[in-house]
UniProtKB/Swiss-Prot annotation:
The lineage of its organism: Eukaryota, Metazoa, Chordata, Craniata, Vertebrata. The gene is NFIA. It holds the Pfam family NfI_DNAbd_pre-N. This is Nuclear factor 1 A-type. Belongs to the CTF/NF-I family. Keywords: Activator, DNA replication, DNA-binding, Nucleus, Transcription, Transcription regulation. Residues 376-389, 511-522 have a biased composition (Polar residues). One of its GO terms (biological process) is positive regulation of DNA-templated transcription. It comes from Gallus gallus (Chicken).
Length: 522
């Protein structure tokens, strides 16, 4: 942004970055010219001549932009300390034009009045803060004794301590208006035709050795009217100034982050550091239509979207249930409600057969393993703060499925729907013979949220492997063949005892808790 050789670390404060393009280059020339004249008077005990003063003026005007910016940045840092902390944000926003002008109060001196500061590290000359603000941001050539000529606008609520440049004006007296007319007339006549005298000059010719009326006005300064107006309107950061513009300042601001986080070290202050930071901020935006990185309400961008999940990336898109189902590769809530009305009272693990297939089809290109770092294209999903899978978390956060990182999706699908989804996974439904089956506990599926079941004609008993070698028995009441372990009840027993104990599956395939599974016989 600046040359590292001319600025120190304290002069990279974003407060200075935002205000520096609005400082007039005339302020550097004016403050230094007054100091040179005062120093010359102390040394020689006489005032500087016109030729010497004009030479100093030309020297100051032709000074390098880096020197002017270094001086302005130091002065802005001093002004920042004199402005109350609660008004610093309003000061930047009003000067840069992002907010209507409001009062900006400064820290008072010991008597409760406007504080005075030295602008050139000189203790022998101090300036009122409101005078400094007018010279810096308006380019008005005021003396240090012109504090009484300043007037505050009627909108100012605290005229004694307000340093808002838009609330400070200069009172113009009758003498000023009178002198301005003749100075402007003389300047315009010289610019028209210096060789030919005008009618006013002919009428005001000295008679009998007496001076004319206009000759009684002596111009003490070395600036002409046109030159003064021209140099007072030139910003200090123009030309070869900082490599940032006002449009860049819209997206990077000091108030979006803490000052400690925004403070940069000296080696990183290259000319491209600001543009790199601005590009990285703009890359984190979802779309150009979003709200800007910095708003006038002082909203911090870091306060939002920190705890939002990846399914909240596109609220307008996910507000439609059909779109939400298409995004996740899962049936929408409306489809779930419709399937729940088909006559089945309780869900079962077999309902995840279609769900697991859709889940693997849609998410397998993204999720490659428990320690992988998924990345999605900006056209589909965009995650400004956190990746899809939190690295220290044991589960993949999903509204319907919990996926343990120790198992792959392929094994998960085989567990839920073995052999095309027509075997042991389909339990818990009424079979065509009227017998019902118990639920098989699955540690990978939470009970409250399960997908819809397949059609009931597809459900039928399937033989399950058991460690016991006893032959399977046949129930006498239901007419259906019991495919698994020996029975411990008779048809004449009570209904509470008409169950067949089922042993656990192969422990290498799935880890089922030690509670016994039972089938209802009858």
């Amino acid at each position: 942004m600046y040359s590292p050789l001319c600025l120190t670390q304290d002069e990279f404060h974003p407060f200075i970055e935002a205000l520096l393009p609005h400082v007039r280059a005339f302020a550097y020339t004016w403050f230094n010219l007054q100091a040179r004249k005062r120093k010359y008077f102390k040394k020689h005990e006489k005032r500087m001549s016109k030729e010497e003063e004009r030479a100093v003026k030309d020297e100051l005007l032709s000074e390098k932009p880096e020197v002017k910016q270094k001086w302005a940045s130091r002065l802005l840092a001093k002004l920042r300390k004199d402005i109350r902390p609660e008004f610093r944000e309003d000061f930047v926003l009003t000067v840069t034009g992002k907010k209507p002008p409001c009062c900006v109060l400064s820290n008072p001196d010991q008597k409760g009045k406007m504080r005075r500061i030295d602008c050139l590290r000189q203790a022998d000359k101090v300036w009122r803060l409101d005078l400094v603000m007018v010279i810096l941001f308006k380019g008005i050539p005021l003396e240090s004794t012109d504090g009484e000529r300043l007037v505050k606008s009627p909108q100012c609520s605290n005229p004694g301590l307000c340093v808002q440049p838009h609330h400070i004006g200069v009172s113009v007296k009758e003498l000023d208006l009178y002198l301005a007319y003749f100075v402007h007339a003389a300047d315009s006549s010289q610019s028209e035709s210096p060789s030919q005298p005008s009618e006013a000059d002919i009428k005001d010719q000295p008679e009998n050795g007496h001076l004319g009326f206009q000759d009684s006005f002596v111009t003490s300064g070395v600036f002409s009217v046109t030159e003064l107006v021209r140099v007072s309107q030139t910003p200090i950061a123009a030309g070869t100034g900082p490599n940032f513009s006002l449009s860049d300042l819209e997206s990077s601001s000091y108030y979006s982050m803490s000052p400690g986080a925004m403070r940069r070290s000296l080696p990183s202050t290259s000319s491209t550091s600001s543009t790199k930071r601005i590009k990285s901020v703009e890359d984190e935006m979802d779309s150009p239509g979003e709200e800007p990185f910095y708003t006038s309400q002082g909203r911090s961008p870091g306060s939002g979207s920190q705890s939002s999940g990846w399914h909240e990336v596109e609220p307008g898109y996910l507000r439609n249930p059909e779109h939400r189902g298409a995004l996740h590769g899962m049936p929408s809530p409306t489809a779930l409600k419709k399937s729940e009305k088909s006559g089945f009272s309780s869900p079962s693990p077999s309902q995840t057969s279609s769900l697991g297939t859709a889940f693997t089809q849609h998410h397998r290109p993204v999720i490659t393993g428990p320690r992988a770092s998924p990345h999605a294209t900006p056209s589909t999903l965009h995650f400004p703060t956190s990746p899809i899978i939190q690295q220290p978390g044991p589960y993949f956060s999903h509204p319907a499925i919990r996926y343990h990182p120790q198992e792959t999706l392929k094994e998960f699908v085989q567990l839920v729907c073995p052999d095309a989804g027509q075997q042991a996974g389909q339990v818990g439904f009424l079979n065509p013979n009227g017998s019902s089956q118990g639920k098989v506990h699955n540690p990978f599926l939470p009970t409250p949220m399960l997908p819809p079941p397949p059609p009931p004609p597809m459900a039928r008993p399937v033989p399950l492997p058991v460690p016991d070698t006893k032959p399977p028995t046949t129930s006498t009441e239901g007419g259906a063949t019991s495919p698994t372990s020996p029975t411990y009840s008779t048809p004449s027993t009570s209904p509470a005892n008409r169950f067949v104990s089922v042993g656990p599956r192969d422990p290498s395939f799935v880890n089922i808790p030690q509670q016994t599974q039972s089938w209802y016989l009858g």
